[in-house]
Amino acid sequence: MGGLSIWHWLIVLLIVALVFGTKKLRNIGNDLGSAVKGFKDGMKDGDAPADAQQLPRSGTVDVNAKEATRSDSNKA
């Protein structure tokens, strides 16, 4: 009694088709499909390696150098 049978879903689908029209529903389906395709393409592009300019430089960073500069300015 709590679940909807196939007949309930068919009636709902028929009402939606009458209200919006099949052409409008087809356009909505096409728009939704192209949006999903664009999202998947964007996710593929996000996995591609970045350009050499955008990659972080590999090397060591001297964290103590900044703190040493601060200590010198506080003494003066």
UniProtKB/Swiss-Prot annotation:
Keyword Signal tagged: no
Transmembrane portions of the chain: 1-21
Pfam families: TatA_B_E
Membrane topology label: Single-pass membrane protein
Amino acid composition bias (Basic and acidic residues), ranges on this chain: 64-76
GO molecular function, one term: protein transmembrane transporter activity
Region (Disordered) residue spans: 43-76
Keyword Cell membrane assigned: yes
GO cellular component, one term: TAT protein transport complex
GO biological process annotation, one example: protein transport by the Tat complex
InterPro entries linked: TatA/B/E, TatA/E
Quaternary assembly: The Tat system comprises two distinct complexes: a TatABC complex, containing multiple copies of TatA, TatB and TatC subunits, and a separate TatA complex, containing only TatA subunits. Substrates initially bind to the TatABC complex, which probably triggers association of the separate TatA complex to form the active translocon.
NCBIfam families, A to Z: PRK02958.1, tatAE
Stated role: Part of the twin-arginine translocation (Tat) system that transports large folded proteins containing a characteristic twin-arginine motif in their signal peptide across membranes. TatA could form the protein-conducting channel of the Tat system.
Similarity annotation: Belongs to the TatA/E family.
Protein name, UniProt field: Sec-independent protein translocase protein TatA
Organism: Burkholderia multivorans (strain ATCC 17616 / 249)
Taxonomic classification: Bacteria, Pseudomonadati, Pseudomonadota, Betaproteobacteria, Burkholderiales
